[in-house]
Regions:
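A conserved beta-strand-to-alpha-helix junction within the catalytic ATP-binding
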Residues: 16, 110-126, 132-145
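Short conserved segment of the HATPase_c
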Residues: 215-229
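Acidic ATP/Mg2+-coordinating residue in the GHKL
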Residues: 210
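Glycine-rich GHKL/ HATPase_c ATP-binding element in histidine kinases
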Residues: 267-269
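Membrane-proximal HAMP signal-relay module
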Residues: 1-47, 51, 56-74, 81, ...
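Short beta-strand/loop element within the Bergerat-fold HATPase_c
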Residues: 190-202
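Conserved micro-motifs of the catalytic ATP-binding
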Residues: 103-110, 146-148, 153, 158-167
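Short helix-loop "hinge" at the ATP-lid/N-box region of the Bergerat-fold HATPase_c
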Residues: 183-184
Length: 280
């Protein structure tokens, strides 16, 4: 067994002694290692592809421009705009990749007020929402009309008495920012995004509701996978690499929380970021 063939399994003896148990445990370890290496390999391949795309656009446009005999001023301006857009895309992608690899090194000892955090996200994204023609709102009411099942909060158990959570303010800000930005990007024209902060059974819930086209059931878990995009052409047009929600998922898990799609239909979707609440 070598690094290249970790999928190889040892034959488990037909017995119930320690050797059989040890062999079975060893095979399970190999399977986990093989899965981890495969995931890392796929992630690296996807990252390389995403990095290559803006570089290819830059190279192609520069080569075309180089062949022009006497470029006009408007052509220079178009070239500069393209370079600015593609370098910004590269910078954002590299920054997100670094964030995902450095999560464990960020201290998580801040006492974070979620209402204040959401307010800061709104201030920063207000120009983005205005440019997109999307209205953003904070809903501080104490009741919501949620369907009730094993994954969905019961309105009767919700309240607004959110205290604080302990974690990294920087990372939690990034998680909420990504959720709200995503809801703005993939919304309908003149749509809206509503954010509310609730508490249920010691869990703080940041609910982000949009008026987009919804997310199909088969994609509701996949959207949190790295590099996954429901509509690849639309995501590329908006500069997305499919890492925003994956980073949210990583940050949530790093704070002993979860993120998932609570409900989705043709009228829009609601995503919930759930985090443990502190009592101090």
């Amino acid at each position: 067994i070598q690094a290249q063939n970790l999928s190889t399994q040892l034959e488990v003896p037909n017995s119930k002694d320690e050797i059989a148990q040890l062999t079975s445990s060893f095979n399970e370890m190999l399977a986990r290692l093989d899965n981890a290496f495969s995931t890392q390999k796929q992630f690296s391949a996807n990252a390389a592809h995403e990095l290559r795309t803006p570089l290819a656009v830059l190279q192609t446009n520069l080569e075309v421009f180089e062949k022009k005999q006497e470029p006009e001023m408007v052509e220079y301006q178009q070239l500069f705009t393209m370079i600015k857009e593609q370098t910004a895309r590269l910078s954002q992608l590299v920054g997100t990749l670094l964030d995902m690899t450095n999560l464990k090194s960020v201290p998580r000892t801040d006492h974070v007020s979620l209402e204040e955090l959401v307010d800061e996200v709104f201030c920063d994204l207000d120009p983005v929402a205005e440019k997109a023609g999307i209205s953003i709102h904070f809903d501080d009411s104490s009741s919501q009309d949620w369907h009730t099942d094993v994954h969905t909060p019961d309105a009767s158990a919700l309240n607004n008495n959110i205290r604080n959570i302990t974690g990294s303010y920087v990372l939690l800000y990034r998680a909420v920012y990504n959720l709200v930005e995503n809801a703005i990007k993939y919304n309908r024209p003149n749509g809206s995004v509503t954010v509310s902060v609730k508490e249920k059974n010691g869990q703080a819930m940041i609910l982000v509701k949009d008026t987009g086209i919804g997310i199909s059931p088969e994609n509701q878990k996949k959207i949190f996978d790295p590099f996954f995009r429901v509509d690849k052409s639309r995501s590329r047009a908006m500069g997305g690499a499919g890492l925003g929600l994956a980073l949210v998922d990583s940050i949530a898990k790093d704070h002993r929380g979860t993120v998932n799609v609570l409900e989705s239909s043709e009228a829009g979707s609601t995503i919930a970021l759930m985090l443990p609440v502190d009592n101090f």
